[in-house]
């Protein structure tokens, strides 16, 4: 059984083909980073137009890469939300149209379920149950996962997501967009302990996050200490340490609350090396396991949508003839498979 996956929720056009016996057969990705760099962030209208230009050619490339034709595809999965409404509509329209033309089922996929299941693409996939840390530019959530579609929200950011805070602080430090990875690179040159940032909401019970205050703290620190290269690196180090420590503290609480021994982290920020190292060390001390996808599957991609589509297809999920998307779509609303 082979599923074509289409991802167009934001600023990456991702196309992949997944086979339930052979695994990933094709994976094509186009990033719009250069398109949006001059604006310092994603411009929704530009993103939508670029998806229109790139989606079909990438599908053709994926078929070529896999050596397959349309007749070999058993279902078409597409990201139906959450995300930018115009960008979502491009992928949904193409996906639904291809499914109709090829006479195969269309499978709407939740973008964050795609991220959550991305580690399943690895050679050593996690088993249920586990705590999932979904950490990206748009979301920071802790989820109790006991099966496909069996998701309980334990905590989430009440303001900025961790990835958004990374990008905003990077901009304050004079780094280009997207700044998160550049900030982490700069932080590696920083001196630990010169500056100490707060660990937001760790001094009270609960599993919610708040990262907007760290951006303000960074702005004040930059104002008071100047912007020479070493100072900027030290501020980047302090900021990254604060975010990573906050995520780690909340993960500990979630694991204690659920009693689970497995931690899965997914989303763009899960590619952060410092975060990976700290959580791996934490889980080793707890005699548990931590799982994450390879870096290219942490950011938005078609492979995770193709895989999630396969899982949902086997559970009987299909879309009707209409094209609909959900820019806001709580993960907990998904049905169990």
Curated annotation (Swiss-Prot):
**One Gene Ontology term of the molecular function aspect:** iron ion binding
Task: List the gene name.
Answer: tsaD
Keyword flag Phosphoprotein: no
Q: Which Pfam families match?
A: TsaD
Q: Which residues bind substrate?
A: 134-138, 167, 180, 272
The taxonomic lineage of its organism, from the top, reads: Bacteria, Pseudomonadati, Pseudomonadota, Gammaproteobacteria, Enterobacterales
For this chain's record, the cofactor binding note is:
Binds 1 Fe(2+) ion per subunit.
What does UniProt give as GO cellular component?
cytoplasm
Subcellular location, record wording: Cytoplasm
Q: What does this protein do?
A: Required for the formation of a threonylcarbamoyl group on adenosine at position 37 (t(6)A37) in tRNAs that read codons beginning with adenine. Is involved in the transfer of the threonylcarbamoyl moiety of threonylcarbamoyl-AMP (TC-AMP) to the N6 group of A37, together with TsaE and TsaB. TsaD likely plays a direct catalytic role in this reaction.
PROSITE patterns per UniProt: GLYCOPROTEASE
- What is the protein's major site of localization? cytoplasm
Name listed for the protein in its UniProt record: tRNA N6-adenosine threonylcarbamoyltransferase
Cofactor entry: Fe(2+)
Protein EC: 2.3.1.234
Q: Which reaction does it catalyse?
A: L-threonylcarbamoyladenylate + adenosine(37) in tRNA = N(6)-L-threonylcarbamoyladenosine(37) in tRNA + AMP + H(+)
Listed binding positions for Fe cation are 111, 115, 300
Q: Which UniProt keywords apply?
A: Acyltransferase, Cytoplasm, Iron, Metal-binding, Transferase, tRNA processing
In which family does this protein belong, per the annotation?
Answer: Belongs to the KAE1 / TsaD family.
Q: Record's HAMAP family? A: TsaD
Q: Name one GO biological process term.
A: tRNA threonylcarbamoyladenosine modification
């Amino acid at each position: 059984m082979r599923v074509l996956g289409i991802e167009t929720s934001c600023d990456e056009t991702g196309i992949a083909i997944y086979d339930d016996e052979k695994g990933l057969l094709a994976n094509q990705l186009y990033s719009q980073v250069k398109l949006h760099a001059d604006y310092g962030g994603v411009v929704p209208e530009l993103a939508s137009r670029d998806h229109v230009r790139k989606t079909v050619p990438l599908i053709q490339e994926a078929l070529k890469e896999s050596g397959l034709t349309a007749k070999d595809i058993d279902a078409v999965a597409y990201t139906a939300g959450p995300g930018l409404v115009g960008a979502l509509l491009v992928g949904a329209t193409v996906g639904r149209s291809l499914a109709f033309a090829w006479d195969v089922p269309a499978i709407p996929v939740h973008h964050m379920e795609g991220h959550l299941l991305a580690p399943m693409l690895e050679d050593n996939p996690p088993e249920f149950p586990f705590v999932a840390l979904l950490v990206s530019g748009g979301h920071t959530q802790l989820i109790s996962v006991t099966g496909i579609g069996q998701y309980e929200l334990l905590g989430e950011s009440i303001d900025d997501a961790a990835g958004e805070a990374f990008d905003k602080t990077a901009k304050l430090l004079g780094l280009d967009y997207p700044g998160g990875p550049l900030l982490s690179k700069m932080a590696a040159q920083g001196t630990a302990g010169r500056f100490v940032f707060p660990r937001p909401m760790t001094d009270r019970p609960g599993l919610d996050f708040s990262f907007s205050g760290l951006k303000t703290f960074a702005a004040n620190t930059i104002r008071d200490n100047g912007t020479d290269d070493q100072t900027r690196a030290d501020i980047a180090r302090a900021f990254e340490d604060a975010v990573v420590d906050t995520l780690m503290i909340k993960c500990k609480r979630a694991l204690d609350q659920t009693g689970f021994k497995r931690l899965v982290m997914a989303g763009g920020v899960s590619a952060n090396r410092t975060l990976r190292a700290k959580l791996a060390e934490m889980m080793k001390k707890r005699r548990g396991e931590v799982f994450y996808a390879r870096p290219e599957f942490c950011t938005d991609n078609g492979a995770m949508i193709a895989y999630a589509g396969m899982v949902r297809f086997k559970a009987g999920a299909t879309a009707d003839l209409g094209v609909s998307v959900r820019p806001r779509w709580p993960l907990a609303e998904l049905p169990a498979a």
